[in-house]
From Swiss-Prot:
Name this polypeptide is given: RhoGEF domain-containing protein gxcJ
One of the record's GO cellular component terms: cytosol
Organism: Dictyostelium discoideum (Social amoeba)
Region feature Disordered, mapped onto this chain: 114-216, 259-333, 429-460, 484-508, 604-639, 1084-1155
Comp. bias regions, Low complexity: 115-153, 161-211, 260-303, 441-457, 604-637, 1093-1121, 1128-1137
Length: 1155
């Protein structure tokens, strides 16, 4: 087949270009073989590999250089794609019998040799522990630490097997409880045995360190050299079997306990007397043992875990608190079915004087231990260590072999299992609370008691970082049982102990004796007749417990011994009150307090937690053991109590007392009382409603006083900023005239307000007195407010020059300006003077009428309003005069008019359409009427209609208001949105002018052409008339205080505009006719009234005289001294109002007559 030469040459060119990929367009380099391939191909021509971007997730082949997968929309950026080296193969799963998450990780599997060494170490530790238990009965703390060391090693190897750890703890606890009972009762102490135990402890520590090295070696094993998991199981099985064997031995010991045998008081008392006599020697030896135990704990227990110790009730209370802190034992008498709820609260070391409830972190622990364990009577918590107290029946029957195991199991199953609550609270110590009531044993005058309580030689004057030590209650056993029989629920008592870092509170539920009533609780044993020795022992333990807190002590206080004499008790009561005041107050949510009844028994707590409830919502927080004053009949059997209790405070009464104190403090208007409130209450309320009203009013008053102080301070700082940032630097660039025109008397205002603020924060004057005294000085604001508009015009003219503009730009970068310009600062004096009456009125409303500052506030409000009214009227006069001068200069054809007459002032101006060719009798179409647009100027006695040409006005006509009448026209000739009114001259041949409203609105002359200033509040919706201090009897229509910006009245609709003009002209006409009928004498006399009264006392054109009467009533009723001249003025005003009503009816009848 012949091929055309042109086609052959074209194909050769194409082939050459495909080979020379770098010189071709639309070619991409293959990532595999790095050869060029056209982009149109999906595979490489050389190696057939993919050219496009393949998704690393769904393996979809996308376009070249695409950023996202078309199918799964995943990002295809190279940085987001994981490298191949980072993806490791999935390890092969090997089934093993032990469900341990740690053993699956092969990096920590020990070798066979290491397992054998661990077993040998464990056997050695167990042998050492057995030797220590046999040789030393008094040093149970060393044995306990050795056992804990072994347990820590076991738990580190089999960390996941939680049940085995629990069983191990249970087994060790049984040995500990036996050792405790023997140590407490025993009389001998062998120092040689202590040394042997210390050596054993050191040996055990060495073994433990060797076991710890196993973990370091195991974590550094290579992943490639793995041994089978079955090889690591054998040491664990041996450990578990060893634990189970020890558990069986302990169960035999527990089964040997006798059944509910009645407690023999003689045995327990003999044991206690033995301990009492040897307490001094035991304390010395225990101190040596505690040092050794502390070293063992530091070496082995890296992560502190609170454990449980077991001890008897009476000796555990007598023991040194240092020993209790360092014992870490695990009880064996916790039942399987018990649900233990733990609330952890973490205490912070803080020296602030208030108590704050911390956050709670709650969880629940179910202790799965042996069901045949003995019952728990009470718990004592110390630094996270729980000490269980065994009943006296259990203590007395340890050596008795006559028992029935079935009966024991049945009795234990019938008893309700208590619930244990552990809480560690985040507290801020110490709260400043009111002094608690005096303890009864200090106030009671017991003549028959001969007991002397010897307190410690040095106690703390203020305890900042600690809470009270565990208290001991001692009472008659028989009286206790009699009272407990009458209780409806099982009582509970708690003993709270804390250190500087942890606060632990526990609630202990005491189990009843099976042979007595369930309500009878065995908690306190009879004391020996020799009370002096037992109390001395208690005082020694208390002294040791307080000495353990030396790290947080700052001051010490010596207390003399408390005897039966009343004088010594009273002398020491104040010292004890100082100690009690330093303790934190009880929690506000659950103020459950165990109290002693009059017969000496322990009162049951009605709010104790329910054992069947698994949650810990109803946790009983027994704060302290309280004192009870015995009756005269029981003085012989009364036994004193030694305790450092938490203050027992009724929080509801305390809150009410604080509220009453606050109400009393807020009743005083002194500023110093607001900042530093007094602690004494001067007023009390009889009912809850009155108390609530006083508190609400006092809170509002306090907020208002704070607002006045803070805003005044900010205002003084702003005035100082104007002077230092703007005024003084500009004096170098501008003349003195320009500086006075811009800043006016700003420095004088700053001096006055600075003195005002100093008087407000003083301790001698009240708010009303300060403003009443400083009211005359505030008149300087009149000059500033009158020339404020001129100040803004001068500033705008100054900013037009480039040099000054750059200077102001540099000033705006200063931080004290807060991003505001000079205009924002110059308006602040105008705003502040108008805010004073508003703040004082609100403060007057929030002040009680019987308050001593109430009449002063009324007087201050009256004076400030009068000053503000004067400033407002003067400003209106100034603006009216300035506008009138502009009109005279720009008005043509009004040479004969005297617009600057003394009794004449401008009120309104705006646009109107003059209707030409309109008659009321003839109905004509709208097309035949002609409208001529013009501008009107309404004075108080004159109406002008002009035609505007640029900035000038040409007068078309004018008329006196006392010669015309006004009528509202209703005709079909005008649209519905057009309002028409007519002015008709009185008399034969009088002229008539008909006007129609336009789109433009009328405005009050007092705020026309201004950008900021003072405006009357009622003029925002209607252009009402105002008097600038005229003598024609026309007073100000509006209120005297307000703030405006710009021509705010230019947004009214057309109907309101026309109604405003119509109503204003009508009232002005009525006003002029009233002046004619009343005569010039009455007019001149009436004009003198506003000068002696408040600016609000003038009559308004709209007939609203309520402001007049209200202001008059305030001035007459509120002022403490009402003069006879004010009463005469009030009577004259009432006569004038009656005459106005009579004349107004006559004027309206004349105005409504149609010509």
């Amino acid at each position: 087949m012949l091929i055309h030469p042109f086609i052959q040459s074209f194909t050769e060119i194409i082939d050459n270009r495909m080979k020379l990929g770098n010189n071709m367009e639309g070619v991409i380099e293959c990532k595999n073989c790095q050869t060029d391939t056209p982009k149109c191909n999906k595979v490489c021509l050389t190696c057939n590999s993919d050219i496009g971007e393949r998704c690393w997730r769904c393996n979809y082949l996308g376009k070249i250089n695409s950023k996202f997968c078309f199918r799964c929309n995943v990002k295809l950026h190279p940085t987001s794609i994981p490298p191949k080296d980072s993806i490791q193969p999935i390890p092969i799963f090997t089934k093993h019998p032990i469900a341990s998450t740690l053993l699956i990780n092969k990096s920590i599997i020990p070798t066979q040799s290491e397992n054998n060494s661990i077993n040998d170490n464990n056997n050695n530790n167990n042998n050492n522990n057995n030797n220590n238990n046999n040789n030393n009965n008094n040093n149970n703390n060393n044995n306990n630490n050795n056992n804990n060391n072994t347990n820590n090693n076991d738990s580190k190897i089999i960390d996941a097997t939680i049940t085995n750890t629990k069983n191990n703890n249970t087994t060790n606890n049984n040995n500990i409880s036996n050792n405790n009972s023997s140590n407490i009762i025993s009389n001998s102490n062998n120092n040689n045995n202590n040394n042997n135990n210390n050596n054993n402890n050191n040996n055990n520590n060495n073994n433990n360190n060797n076991n710890l090295n196993f973990l370091k070696k195991s974590t550094s094993c290579d992943n490639g050299s793995f041994e089978s998991i079955s090889d690591s199981i054998s040491p664990i099985k041996d450990i578990i079997n060893n634990i189970n064997n020890r558990t069986k031995d302990i169960e035999k010991l527990n089964s040997a306990l006798p059944l509910n045998k009645k407690s023999n008081s003689s045995t327990s008392w003999s044991n206690f007397n033995t301990f009492k006599n040897n307490s001094k020697t035991n304390n010395n030896n225990n101190n040596n043992n505690n040092n050794n135990n502390n070293n063992n704990n530091n070496n082995n227990n890296n992560n502190y875990k609170p454990t449980i110790t077991s001890s008897q009730t009476q000796p555990s209370l007598m023991e040194n608190s240092k020993d209790i802190d360092k014992k870490e034992k695990i009880p064996s008498n916790i039942n399987n079915n018990r649900s233990t709820t733990i609330i952890y609260k973490y205490q912070e070391d803080n020296s602030e004087d208030y108590t704050d409830d911390g956050d709670f972190e709650e969880f629940q622990i179910n202790s799965n231990l042996t069901s045949e364990s003995s019952s728990i009577d009470s718990l004592i918590i110390k630094d996270g260590v729980i000490a269980t107290t065994v009943t006296s029946s259990t203590i007395n029957c340890i050596n008795d072999n006559n028992f029935d195991p079935d009966q024991l199991s049945s009795s234990t199953s019938s008893i309700k299992k208590p619930k244990l609550f552990y809480s560690i609270t985040k507290k801020k110590l110490v709260s400043q609370s009111p002094p608690p009531p005096q303890p009864p044993f200090l106030a009671s005058a017991s003549s028959s008691s001969t007991t002397t309580i010897t307190t410690t030689d040095s106690l703390e004057k203020s305890i900042k970082d600690s809470t009270p030590i565990a208290t001991t209650l001692v009472n008659d056993y028989q009286n206790q049982n009699q009272n407990l029989n009458n209780e409806s629920a099982a009582s509970s008592s708690s003993l709270s102990t804390t250190t500087t870092t942890t606060t632990t509170t526990t609630t202990t539920t005491l189990l009843p004796d099976s042979q007595t009533n369930l309500n009878n609780l065995i908690f306190i044993e009879k004391l020996n007749n020799d009370l002096s020795g037992s109390i001395e022992t208690l005082n020694n333990s208390l002294n040791n417990s307080l000495n353990s807190l030396n790290s947080s002590f700052n001051f010490r206080l010596n207390l003399n011994s408390i005897t039966n004499n009343e004088d010594k008790r009273l002398s020491n009561s104040s010292l004890l009150d100082e100690i009690i005041d330093a303790f934190p107050s009880p929690p506000s949510k659950n103020p459950y307090i165990s109290v002693l009844n009059t017969s000496g028994g322990i009162g049951s707590n009605s709010n104790s937690s329910n054992n069947n409830n698994s949650n810990s919502n109803n946790i009983t927080n027994s704060n302290s053991s309280s004192f009870s004053k015995k009756n005269s009949n029981n003085n012989n059997n009364y036994q004193p109590v030694i305790s450092l209790p938490i203050p027992i405070v009724n929080h509801q009464q305390q809150q009410q007392q604080q509220q009453l104190q606050t109400a009393a403090i807020l009743g005083n208007n002194n500023i110093n009382f607001i900042q530093n409130p007094s602690s004494t209450s001067t007023t009390t309320t009889t009912t809850t409603a009155s108390t609530t009203t006083i508190l609400i009013k006092s809170d509002h008053r306090t907020n208002l006083i704070k607002e006045i102080l803070t805003t005044e301070l900010d205002y003084v700082n702003d005035l100082e900023t104007i002077i230092n940032v703007f005024c003084k630097p500009l004096r170098d660039f501008i003349s003195n005239e320009d500086s006075a025109s811009i800043f006016s008397n700003i420095e004088q205002i700053w001096q006055i307000n600075k003195q005002l603020y100093e008087n407000l924060i003083s301790n001698t004057l009240t708010i009303g007195q300060v403003f009443s005294n400083m009211s005359d000085s505030l008149k300087v604001y009149s000059v500033y407010c009158n020339y404020h508009q001129k100040s803004l015009d001068s500033l705008n003219q100054l900013l037009k020059t480039p040099q000054n503009e750059s200077f102001f730009d540099q000033l705006l970068s200063k931080p004290e300006l807060r991003g505001m310009g000079p205009h924002s600062f110059l308006i602040k004096p105008v705003q502040r003077i108008c805010k004073y009456p508003l703040l004082l009125k609100e403060l007057l409303k929030a002040t009680a009428e019987d308050h001593f500052d109430y009449p002063q506030l009324i007087l201050a409000v009256e004076k400030i309003e009068k000053i503000v009214g004067t400033i407002n009227s003067q400003k209106k006069e100034m603006e009216t005069w300035q506008r009138t001068m502009q009109l005279i200069q720009n008005l043509k054809g009004a040479d004969n008019l005297q617009l600057l007459a003394a009794n004449r002032h401008l009120i309104l101006e705006g646009s109107l359409h003059l209707v030409i060719g309109f008659t009321e009798n003839a109905e004509k179409k709208n097309s035949s009427l002609k409208f001529k647009k013009g501008v009107y100027f309404l004075f108080n006695d004159l109406f002008l209609f002009t035609k505007q040409k640029g900035t000038t006005y040409k007068l078309l006509f004018y008329t006196q208001l006392d010669n015309v009448l006004i009528h509202a026209n209703v005709s079909n000739c005008f649209p519905a949105d057009k309002s028409v009114f007519s002015l008709v001259e009185i008399g034969v041949g009088g002229r008539k002018w008909t006007f129609c409203n336009t789109n433009s609105n009328s405005s009050n002359i007092s705020n026309s052409g201004n950008s900021s200033g003072i405006i009357n509040s009622s003029s925002s919706s209607s252009g009402s008339c105002s008097n600038g201090g005229n003598s024609s009897g026309y007073n100000n229509l509006n209120n005297t205080c307000g703030i405006y910006s710009g021509n705010s009245n230019n947004n009214n609709n057309n109907n309101n505009n026309n109604n405003n003009i119509f109503s204003t002209i009508q009232k002005l006409i009525e006003k002029t006719w009233e002046d004619k009928f009343m005569g010039q004498s009455s007019v001149s006399h009436r004009l003198s009234i506003p000068s002696t009264s408040s600016p609000n006392n003038g009559a308004s054109l709209n007939g609203n005289s309520s402001s007049n009467s209200s202001s008059t009533s305030i001035s007459t009723v509120g002022s403490p001294n009402v003069t006879s001249a004010a009463k005469q003025q009030q009577q004259l005003q009432q006569q004038q109002q009656s005459s106005k009503k009579r004349n107004r009816r006559l004027v309206k009848s004349l105005v409504n007559i149609k010509t």
